[in-house]
Amino acid sequence: MAKKIQSYIKLQVAAGMANPSPPIGPALGQKGVNIMEFCKLFNKTTENVEKGLPIPVIVTVYSDRSFTFITKTPPASVLLKKAAGIKSGSSKPKIETTGKITKLQIEEIAKTKKNDMTGLNIESMMRSIEGTAKSMGLIVED
């Protein structure tokens, strides 16, 4: 018989840097999950990812306090900031620009995110990521 799911916990954790401090500790502790076990498994899973990159993770907690988790790709905004070499997006996107990004870089980001963006082809994903770039004040060049 399958285990009964108690709850889902959505977190964003820096790759390779999971530790029991907030927000991880309290979120998992409330559900009775072994926090250190999660931290060790998460850090091992994300050891091939650039350290410090925020990784969305969905933790499934079962009624017997066991858990499984799924890691996603970093948010598009983080990948765009990294590709453009900027610290943050513009506070006034239509008025101020923060940097430039090429279509080739957007295509690379789309290919990175293809597993998380279901039901879309590469062109659709590129348009979506272009929209995110524009809302951050980035200029998209050909």
Swiss-Prot record:
Keywords: Methylation, Ribonucleoprotein, Ribosomal protein, RNA-binding, rRNA-binding. SUPFAM superfamilies: Ribosomal L11/L12e N-terminal domain (SSF54747), Ribosomal protein L11, C-terminal domain (SSF46906). One or more lysine residues are methylated. One of its GO terms (cellular component) is cytosolic large ribosomal subunit. PROSITE patterns: RIBOSOMAL_L11. CDD domains: Ribosomal_L11 (cd00349). GO terms for molecular function: large ribosomal subunit rRNA binding; structural constituent of ribosome. Transmembrane segments: none annotated. GO terms for biological process: translation. It comes from the Bacteria. PANTHER family: 60S RIBOSOMAL PROTEIN L12, LARGE RIBOSOMAL SUBUNIT PROTEIN UL11M. Forms part of the ribosomal stalk which helps the ribosome interact with GTP-bound translation factors. Belongs to the universal ribosomal protein uL11 family. Part of the ribosomal stalk of the 50S ribosomal subunit. Interacts with L10 and the large rRNA to form the base of the stalk. L10 forms an elongated spine to which L12 dimers bind in a sequential fashion forming a multimeric L10(L12)X complex. HAMAP family: Ribosomal_uL11 (MF_00736). This is Large ribosomal subunit protein uL11. It comes from Buchnera aphidicola subsp. Schizaphis graminum (strain Sg). The gene is rplK.
